UniProtKB/Swiss-Prot annotation:
Main subcellular location of this protein, as a coarse class: plastid
Gene Ontology biological process terms, A to Z: photosynthesis
Name used for this protein in its record: Photosystem I reaction center subunit IX
One of the record's GO cellular component terms: chloroplast thylakoid membrane
Cell location: Plastid, Chloroplast thylakoid membrane
């Protein structure tokens, strides 16, 4: 059980969560602003 906890606390799980969150964020941005090269909330 200790080995399992050690494995779950290292890079594969952290990177999977990070890339999953990043992919979700990019999907949501592209859902609200499809094919946007310039985002409206950055222009002044």
């Amino acid at each position: 059980m200790r080995d399992l906890k050690t494995y779950l606390s290292v890079a594969p799980v952290v990177s999977t969560l990070w890339f999953g969150a990043l992919a979700g964020l990019l999907i949501e941005i592209n859902r609200f602003f499809p094919d946007a090269l310039i985002f409206p909330f950055f222009s002044f």
